[in-house]
Amino acid sequence: MASNKVVFSVLLLVVLSVLAAAMATMADHHQVYSPGEQCRPGISYPTYSLPQCRTLVRRQCVGRGAASAADEQVWQDCCRQLAAVDDGWCRCGALDHMLSGIYRELGATEAGHPMAEVFPGCRRGDLERAAASLPAFCNVDIPNGPGGVCYWLGYPRTPRTGH
């Protein structure tokens, strides 16, 4: 009888140890693989975020002619700015914040129909697709989107929350 209690106690300790280790691993996983409270403008990326990417996205949206050396420099600068956002989880947030800034600059609302023009020759959906695809083009990691495309691209009619 006493040996059964010892075996049961040992098994209970083993199970509790395994559960404690699993909980610690899950907590570490959540901390590493999810956006934190620090993913905000002025904290994880500048308040006026990604100025070269703003230029690039607007040029892409209107389908400006042949690429020039200046355009290549804008691409490189944009990719450097996007890579400089230290936390991969925050990159889509920085792009979303950038789009919000573009809309404010143009006097457009943040939410709207994807086919609506935000400026001559540029529809909202095209502008958002150009921004959402930058991580893939720049080959920077974003852990929250398939194929390097920001998750909010899949929901063009859903207003973005902004940051």
UniProtKB/Swiss-Prot annotation:
Five disulfide bonds are present. Disulfide bonds join 39-90, 53-78, 61-122, 79-138, 92-150. InterPro entries: Allergen/amylase_inhib_rice, Allergen/soft/tryp_amyl_inhib, Allergen/tryp_amyl_inhib_CS, Bifun_inhib/LTP/seed_sf, Bifunc_inhib/LTP/seed_store. GO terms for molecular function: IgE binding; nutrient reservoir activity; serine-type endopeptidase inhibitor activity. Residues 1-27 form the signal peptide. It comes from the Eukaryota. GO terms for cellular component: extracellular region. It is found in: Secreted. Its main location: secreted. It holds the Pfam family Tryp_alpha_amyl. Keywords: Allergen, Disulfide bond, Secreted, Seed storage protein, Signal, Storage protein. Seed storage protein. Belongs to the cereal trypsin/alpha-amylase inhibitor family. This is Seed allergenic protein RAG1. It comes from Oryza sativa subsp. japonica.
